[in-house]
Amino acid sequence: MKPEEIAAMSGDGKSWSLEELEATMLPGHASTKAGRDVIFSWLARYQEAKASGQNAINGTVGSLLEDSGELAVNPVVSKTLREQADLEMSAYAPLPGLPHFRTMVQELAMGDGLSVIQHHGIHTDAIITPGGTGALYMSARNLLRPGDAILLRELHWGPYNTIAKECGISTATWPLHGGESQVDEEALTSMLSQLMKDQNHVLSWLNDPAHNPTGMSLTSESRARVLGIFADAATQNPDKGVTLFIDGAYAAYSKEHHGWGDTLAEFAKECIWPGNMLVSFGFSASKSHTLYGQRCGAMVMLHPNRAFVDKLVEVMLHTGRGTWSGAARLPQATLHSIHSDVDKYVGWLRERDRLQQM
């Protein structure tokens, strides 16, 4: 008898098939899961081909590469990381994140627009997450009910579907293009209206700027239109909760790094922010600071009520504590060291701009 056959036998000599084990040991919602998504499956095939000497090209890259094919690493970041004190390398970080990191990451997300937004009565806060994916997960887990649908653009990053499934929600989509304009306003308005008929909360993940996988970025006019549509939907449905989540994972390499900060600043100055509308940013240091494996991100939240922002922090922290416990301290300290030192910041900026031009 083969070892695997012996291992599959129970104490009474019963031989179990994989199908029987899955049916017995795994609840239905778990048995349908697969660990490797399409991206990582093809990455494994590329690595096998390369190792065997074949002339293979990696088309699955979720990171920045030099023209030589080597991983792009910002030397200012890697040097600063290695300079951190033992405490920063080994100690836990506070569950919400290091205080100076939480302040800094809001500026990284919104730029000069942040102070304007805050000046006009919009309160902001941020919490650390393990990469941008952690922020996406937190929003899906807490801003929709199980069984609800999340609104995405038709063409989107594949793992959005994985995160949605893990949170027990489905997906709805609106077009990536609007014909002669960037935004299909009619389709977006219609989809929001339909979702509000079916559920009490609406959450949309909008990957902009530098949309993955197309690289497209909305213009300032298109951003204003999209924000206006969400604000109108909230105003017209005061008993529904509306959240626009801006996934800015690649914002550092777009032409308008802080375009959404500028758009929100204009909105805060000129318009009434509905109390039932939340705007959130998903920040990721994976690309902006080439810290792919350090898993450093943040969820930034904007709302006109300070007490509600504080409540959101507590809600999101509960999810983080019960899912990944806490996020790493070292990358938070590294980013703060870079952005609080003029020479390091300028060096980081030069390298980021070089990578942007590749």
Residue positions per predicted region:
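Conserved core segment of the aminotransferase class I/II
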Residues: 3-7, 13-14, 104, 269-356
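N-terminal small-domain helix-loop-helix segment of the aminotransferase-like
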Residues: 3-5, 11-18, 23, 29-130
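Short alpha-helical segments and helix-capping/turn motifs at coil-helix boundaries
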Residues: 38-45, 134-139, 189-190, 282
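Hydrophobic/aromatic beta-strand patches that form the interior of the parallel beta-sheet core
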Residues: 57-59, 151, 172, 245, ...
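Active-site donor-binding loop signature of nucleotide-sugar glycosyltransferases
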Residues: 61, 174-178, 284, 329
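Conserved core of the PLP fold type I
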Residues: 85-244, 251-273
